[in-house]
Amino acid sequence: MNFRTEIKLGTAPFEINYQHEVMLVGSCFSGHMGDKLKEMKMNVSSNPFGISFNPHSIAHSISRIIENKEYSAVENFNNLYFSFDHHSSFSLLTKEETLMKINIALHEAHNKLKQANFLFITFGSAWVYRHTAQNRLVANCHKIPNKEFSKELLSIENITTLFNALIGDLKAFNPLLNVVFTVSPVRHLKDGFIENQRSKSILLESVHRIVEANFNCSYF
């Protein structure tokens, strides 16, 4: 008797070898993949902005990496300086240290993405949080009270429009880049079972539409 679901994987439309440069961005699933590739001694860099779950924040971080536009301002809460675009691992006690850490990672990512052969983008959730006072979507709420945010669900149209444009920017920046999309299997049950399923459905359909519309893009 078989107590598990076995999935037979087809042959991928690409091959990665030890000469290739690989960058991974997105949810914690991308971090796990990056760790596995590093264990295999592959040339890998992952999450230069830290873990990010929603497609909007992921796209924003990639655009910022392409532009190589430095950060000059950060927020402050609970005696820590932080960026709404970054994971809390970038939060430090002084503004200067925080900006330095953020901008060093930004410049390194710009150079690595320029040379990369593969970019893995992992979506985690279509649910996003908007900071009400600043009217902006954030990658991380940094434990700021919930009352300062509103919760929204990204649409398939929003995600596909955003990434179809981004793919064009990526190809102009690095014509040899192959983009591989994944959707994290990790369930976000804090959103609720049904809400998690809605989110994953939106992400999967969005990814397949993006892949079908763009050359050198694939789904894994």
Predicted features along the sequence, with ranges:
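Extracellular glycan-modifying ectodomains
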Residues: M1-F220
